[in-house]
Amino acid sequence: MDYKKLADMLFPHITKSVSYYEDVVFPARNLSPGAKVTRLAPSPTGFIHLGNLYGAFVDERLAHQSNGVFILRIEDTDDKRKVEGAVETIISSLEFFNLKFDEGAGINGETGNYGPYFQSNRAEIYQTVAKHLVEMGRAYPCFCSEEELEEIRKQQLAENVNTGYYGKWAVHRNLTLEEVQKHLENNESFVIRFKSMGNPEETFEIDDAIRGRLSMQVNFQDIVLLKANGIPTYHFAHVVDDHLMRVTHVVRGEEWLSTLPIHYELFTTLGWDLPVYCHTAHLMKIDNGVKRKLSKRKDPELGLEYYMQLGYHPAAVREYLMTILNSNFEEWRIQNPDSDINDFPFSLNKMSNSGALFDLDKLNDVSKNVLAKIPAEEIYEFLLKWAKEYKKEIVNLLEEHKDSVIKLLSVGRNSEKPRKDLIYCEQIFEFIKYFFDEYFAIVDKYPDNVDEEEAKKILKAYLETYDHNDDQTQWFEKIKVIATENGYAAKPKDYKKNPDMYKGHVGDVSTVIRIAIVGRSSSPDLWEIQQIMGEEKVRERIQRLL
């Protein structure tokens, strides 16, 4: 077989060589020893999920911790799965979580010297490599129709053998030049298949940076490299792009493990160095006591939009995911409470290979700790930015009352033990909306030992003695006086010792006042809140209940 002639028959329009792309267009990167090149390569299907972000943080840390390069590549070769606007969604979502790419696709165009970074724009490159494989005798045209392939599959099932296109079932594997020419003259569509030399009885070994040494069955399938429209399959594009973009580490989910033999054979056939493969564990959750994989259908928290709509701070999500990614992160954080997360020495050796457990409750706890360290001014700006996107009806209120909102967010946060009760924007607004008359409502009930008439007596006394200029001590002393004058213990411990002597204690009186002013039985420091509200609003809140 004259493979050179076959290649020219199939690819008359391809005039460049693989070495042209390797040496001229995409030469080896000039990086320091040990620098890693990673890529995130999502498909524009309209859904970007937590698993993408999980893997992206691994990519980002490997690259930036080694002074390497982090690439965003869009794998858009499957027209059937493309969703309008999905690329913009992917990029904006990743930007929201502060993932910084060094090169690749962007909303305003591409950055970098190893593009195009959209696979749909790299057709000539893939066809050049495919032509090279044909010249090597390791790829060939297949003219089988869908019906013929289905018939082959039915026969394989009937004979109880492996399904697929291989060995004796690869009916176009050894077509002559004359036969190929005849098919072409008949304008029959064709795909380009890889000619595998694998034996299904054989295995090979390969190292995975997370899972260690793996023993796997070799690939024996003659997989499709180029579809009939000249666009590559995922398997082929992945190998070509990772080689020419000089990717050193491929981070992907464990669901791709089964494809590793294909990629291994393609890399070795082309004489290219394999990247280091890092197959991450599935994100799992406990559901009714059973551990299962997070599901797009069952679990809204799998989609990144879930966190963006609620307004989780990207720093909180990243902090939490790092606790899942590396088993020693929490210990490091305890020892380095104020250090930047990028100072943490991330390691592939500390990653789980048996299913990473995702827990929303723990994310919320982590978020409380992270937000407690972020200045109120920054939280306000984040809240406003979130509102402009997801809760436009409160934007004007936040802007008109900027100083007051910042002060509200500051209450109880500037002490040795700052309050930790802010989680995400939706919850933060719920937490402070009592300040706005438009949203104020009485949510909680008075203590069981205080009826409506009793509450009015307390509130009336409070209104009569309230002086906005009182300091915190003077203010609370007046509340204690109101308590004792109305039969309540001035100290909870006094009530605890002699419950029959009192109606309740000063805490009950404070709760009545708190509910009147903020609508809830618990809140941050009430004296500070009143100082922010101003005397007029405080008196109005009390008066409306009398």
Curated annotation (Swiss-Prot):
Under InterPro entries, the record lists: aa-tRNA-synth_I_cd-bd (IPR045462), aa-tRNA-synth_I_codon-bd_sub2 (IPR020751), aa-tRNA-synth_I_CS (IPR001412), aa_tRNA-synth_I_cd-bd_sf (IPR008925), Glu-tRNA-ligase_bac/mito (IPR004527), Glu/Gln-tRNA-synth (IPR000924), Glu/Gln-tRNA-synth_Ib_cat-dom (IPR020058), GluQ/Sye (IPR049940)
Q: Where does ATP bind?
A: K296
Localization, per the record, is:
Cytoplasm
Does the entry annotate any disulfide bonds, and if so which pairs?
none
Q: Which domain of life is it from?
A: Bacteria
Q: Pfam families under this entry?
A: Anticodon_2, tRNA-synt_1c
Query: What reaction gets catalysed by this protein?
Result: tRNA(Glu) + L-glutamate + ATP = L-glutamyl-tRNA(Glu) + AMP + diphosphate
Q: Might you name a Gene Ontology BP term for this protein? A: glutamyl-tRNA aminoacylation
Q: Which SUPFAM superfamilies match?
A: An anticodon-binding domain of class I aminoacyl-tRNA synthetases, Nucleotidylyl transferase
Chain span(s) of sequence motif 'HIGH' region: 42-52
Under Enzyme Commission nomenclature, its number is 6.1.1.17
The record's Gene Ontology cellular component field reads:
cytosol
Residues spanned by motif 'KMSKS' region:
293-297
- What Gene Ontology molecular-function terms does this entry list? ATP binding; glutamate-tRNA ligase activity; tRNA binding
UniProt keyword terms in alphabetical order? Aminoacyl-tRNA synthetase, ATP-binding, Cytoplasm, Ligase, Nucleotide-binding, Protein biosynthesis
Q: What does this protein do?
A: Catalyzes the attachment of glutamate to tRNA(Glu) in a two-step reaction: glutamate is first activated by ATP to form Glu-AMP and then transferred to the acceptor end of tRNA(Glu).
> What family, per the record?
Belongs to the class-I aminoacyl-tRNA synthetase family. Glutamate--tRNA ligase type 1 subfamily.
How the protein assembles, per its UniProt entry? Monomer.
Q: What protein does this entry describe?
A: Glutamate--tRNA ligase
What is the native source organism of this protein? Acetivibrio thermocellus (strain ATCC 27405 / DSM 1237 / JCM 9322 / NBRC 103400 / NCIMB 10682 / NRRL B-4536 / VPI 7372) (Clostridium thermocellum)
List the gene name.
gltX
